[in-house]
Amino acid sequence: MIINGNQTAMMFCYYIIENKKKLGKLKPTDFLVKTIVTTEVIAEIAKKNNVELRDCYTGFKWIAREIAISEGKQQYIGGGEESFGFLPYDKVRDKDAPASICLICEIAAWAKDQGKTLYDLLVQIYAEYGFSKEFTVNVVRPGKTGADEIKQMMTDFRANPPQELGGSKVVTWKDYQSLEVKHADGSVEKLDMPATSNVLQWFCDDNTKVSVRPSGTEPKIKFYIEVKDPSFKCAGCYNRCTAAAMDKIEAIKK
């Protein structure tokens, strides 16, 4: 199997925390960072290990910002995004491929010492912190007409947000342009973000998450879908849970 960017980010965060715990170096001031469209499994890993997790916008300048504002107060221990970018240390303020390659090799060696493969480690993480399947849909709309279409799509989503996704009830709507969070009970909160961004997120009662944003570099709008399956318990569950999650994703795409 090919391990995707969400899975590598998940393994990086898991290993960094486990290694620090083993060495007695995990501190209350340590923190991780992930982009808002990256898997929520990382949030579970951080939560269960009492490590602060910060969500930021897509792009490593936002991860670098979190490092900068915490210098001398808290320690950054890792951060990344769903598209394979990761920064395991705080010296470089951008995605660091060489360091990430070294880290994944270290993780593979660590797993091998335990008689495991990276796949075995992935399954172990899912069993402990919950299974999720992520899928990105890119809708390409070239030219000025396409740009207008994408703009209208976002306008329509704001005017008529979905009430259900693939049969699951939407219970929370986040709008990073208005910096508002709306809940199904009618309550409204403010989003604590450093700037506005043209991103929408919808969360369902079964922890399905869908994020929508126009690409900043290409003529397309991107839909990031994440589906959970709490029935995942062991390696034998992987194919079944993946197939069920893909069925759910297909239902959401419709």
Tell where the protein language model's regions lie, with residue ranges.
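Cysteine protease catalytic core and zymogen-processing segment of caspase-like enzymes
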Residues: 1-20
